[in-house]
Amino acid sequence: MTHKGISLIVIFLIAGLAVAYFFCLPKELFAGTEYSTVVTDRNGELLGARIAKDGQWRFPECDTIPPKFQTSIIEFEDKWFALHCGVNPVSIARAAIGNVKAGHVTSGGSTITMQVVRMLRGKERTLWQKMIEAVLATRLEMRYSKEKILALYASHAPFGGNVVGIEAAAWRYYGKPAEELSWGETATLAVLPNSPADIYPGRNRKSLLNKRNRLLHKMFKDGCIDSTDLELALEEPLPAAPEALPQEACHLVEYYRKTNPGKRSRTSIDIHLQRQIQAITDQWNEEFSRIGIYDIAAVVVDVHTGEVLSYVGNANPRRKRPGADVDIARSPRSTGSILKPFLYCAMLQEGELLPNTLLPDIPMNLGGFSPQNFNRQFDGAVPASEALARSLNVPAVYMLKKFGTQRFLEVLRRCGMTSLGKSADHYGLSLILGGGECTLLDVTKAYSRISLSYQAADTTFNDRKSPLHNFPLKDKCALWYTLDALKEVNRPDEIDWRLISSVKRVAWKTGTSYGFRDAWAVGVTPEYAVGVWVGNAEGQGAPGLVGARTAGPVMFDIFNMLPSKELNDKYAADGWFLEPVYGDYIKAEVCPLSGHLAGPGCESSDLLMLPRKAMKSEPCPYHKIVDGMKTFILPPSMEWYYRQNHPEYAPYSPENSENYAIMEFIYPEGGSTIYIPRQLDGSIAGITFNLAHRLPSAKIFWHLDNEYVGQTQFIHQLSLTPAPGRHTVTVVDDKGNSLSVGFTIAVNEKGGR
């Protein structure tokens, strides 16, 4: 072979070796390594962690390491770390001489960089492997800075048992972050990777103590610590058995284990607030458990940032009980009445309702659905704001029927209710009473956006990064009346907060689901939104499970401990919302009795600010000019119940009924289909017809399909058993006034609907 050929071969060999050397390290170091799921609060404090899939406590890689550990590990493992290029010939020579003198291997001479390579490769500790590690170490030094190599070492070094990395070791052995370790604690951990199996804390304590103390004396000799540091460090005890990691917001930690496993997640949680609120819910959990109510969830949201500051998925998670592991804050639950403010605000915004519009509160049957108020009573007519504050069900159903279930469902979805995935037909009118299921997290965030929307500038709604992007409730006037109505809700302790300056003002709403299975309380101020759910995770009801009596007190306890913020702008000050002086609204004359726009028959009027669309609403339909006098006349069905609660109401007694209805069917509704169950003996159950007459003393004569069936006086109710099919009931009073209603009877063979 010629000299030129040999030269080419050498060149190719050198080039090949250079290429091999350049690519000898994997592109991503420690790829495929399983890490623990780590969750921290907004300031980086550990909320909790979950062990890696391989059973190791190995936190995700850190970018930097504490200065004390950096000093300690360099002093103990590789004093010349800052000077060498991955391999220290002096250390290798010293180790070789020492091993020969001892007659066995006493030191390996590996640098920190070589140890990182060994951790990466996981090969046996042989001479050949050490040579490979030396080559790879030089390449590692070319790729990364000294700080990065130290961070890799600190993240992957073994610290005994199933503990890997300085962060996990600091928490497992000392129950604190690595940055807070003392010199004695840091030195203890620094000597562990050298022989983790032999000096695992709790096993060979004497050997561990000797190694730690030698390192401390060495650092003192080299000027790393002073005499005081040395004296204090030598007096520190060794760690005992491994400690449990923090368990703050454990349901939130579990959520991140499922959604972001093996990663480090920094949340918006304030750990100090979290601990306080956890203590509140734990205390109430002890109280409620005595009456068969075992679970509580609570969420606190910062109104202006939309951040979740505290997240209690379930109280007392360490207390072993069925359902303790269920994250209620993210579990869809029946909403009860908690969604009513969104309907009230939406209708105000669209001009389909005025703040105090009188709404019917009378028995209704809407396609077989007959809503009932919580107290089983009827007011006849009630202002819309009062109906919201008192959480009356019948007016709410009337409002939803008028607004439309599909429209309201779209509003709720745009407000952030992510669990309402079924059609409007599926929910029906019961949507406003708990026929749908939402999560506490979604509901609390939606309430916070009501507060934020009122305080936000109009341009905020166009910002895609804003929590208000796509939020449908924007009208300042509608939002103000909604918040104002909600602050009138009675508190659980029956105290009038307006008389006590130290009690925080809160706009809040409760909800209780059918069967007393879910109790809600969600409140909002200009600063915070707080949501609380109380019940049993497994779904069983309890007699005392009512929102105002259970979730309400918990919510107010949380509000009372939240820190106040400085608020002083055009929408909020001194902890409460200011009446709007800016915005697209109008001033209009409103009837104080009916809540409608004042009409020509109204005796007086109030000048109110209203959303601009309110001008399309109808004028007062109840004030009439009769014989030259302005008279307030309710429909008979509303009047019957209204005058029982309003003795000042003077019922209208016309001489004839040419212009005003003198009687009205309360039940059934004209054209309705009535589903009645078949009894056990095969017969069909009867129904009770209900009529309101302006003159209760009047005699009413009842006819079913033109056949006389009876008469009533004072209380105009009559039970009949019509056959399946279409029918007409006609009533005639003793003055000759008549009224008819048509309906259809259908038999429900399954026993009801």
Residue ranges and their predicted role:
Residues 2-290, 303, 307-309, 314, ...:
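Juxtamembrane regions of bacterial inner-membrane/periplasmic proteins
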Residues 3, 14, 506-753:
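Soluble, non-transmembrane domains of envelope/secretory-pathway proteins that act on or interact
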Residues 44, 73, 116, 149, ...:
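Residue-level preference for non-acidic, small/hydrophobic
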Residues 45-58, 168, 197-201, 254-261, ...:
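Short pre-catalytic segments that frame enzyme active sites
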Residues 81-90, 128, 150, 225-231, ...:
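Surface-exposed patches in mature extracellular/periplasmic domains of secreted proteins
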Residues 101-125, 179, 242-258, 353-408, ...:
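Conserved catalytic neighborhood of penicillin-recognizing serine enzymes
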Residues 115-122, 155-162, 179, 183-195, ...:
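Glycine-rich, acidic and aromatic/proline-enriched surface loops and short helix-turn segments
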Residues 267-288, 300-302, 311, 319-329, ...:
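A penicillin-recognizing enzyme superfamily signal
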